[in-house]
Amino acid sequence: VAGVAWIDSKRTRLAYVPGLAEPPEISHRGPAEVPPNLRKSVVATFNGGFPLETSNAGLVYRGETVAEMVNGIATLVEYRDGRIDIVNWKHGPTPGPHIWFAKQNLPPIVYEGKLNPNLSDGPEWGATVNNAVRVWRSGLGIDRRGNLIYAAANYQTVGSLAEILQRAGAVRALELDINEDWTSFISYRHPGAGDPSNLLPEMFRPDTRYLTPDERDFFAVYKKPGKTE
């Protein structure tokens, strides 16, 4: 069973939240949890992708390059005008002034609506416990209208994860974290981060993750001002 969440880009905004230890070097770390003053509008949180030392890829935060960008890597981008996209990075190590944040993680698994033909069961898609091929995997895609699609499931290969995202409507997608320790998607039914719930009941981490400081970086989804349920 796969869990899939659709995130309406017109009614929400996305924020990158650094963790206590990841990324290791950053000028503005913040609280490493959903800030208490923003909990009134938080609707979801989810895992942020491989650590920089594992991905060997780029990160931009608040317009500042934390790790140099790498061509050919799938990249979740927020532009300074608030627009979100997932792109195959082709602009070299420097992001340019129009990018507010960018997080890279491995080559795209879906691009222009098609599966990456080079998806395999090898370690290039992440190290797994006991070298298992089918493990917990998560990914993020974007549909033709700019809405985000998160997917996670146990017993997945990178190829089957890509198929889940493609069938859910993603035209571009990247793999996020793998293995049960790192895969989390939590929604909040009430303001103030009330009544949290994991996307899948078998997810290993508690649904209170990200409401206390976490070692790893993550993404938070907030309702835009004036938008109702």
In which residue ranges do the predicted regions lie?
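Zymogen propeptides
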Residues: 1-67
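Extended C-terminal subregions enriched in glycine
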Residues: 86-87, 111-115, 125-229
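Broad, structure-driven detector of short, well-ordered beta-strand segments within folded domains
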Residues: 5, 13, 75-78, 140
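Short glycine-rich loop/turn motifs
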Residues: 1-3, 73, 106, 134-139, ...
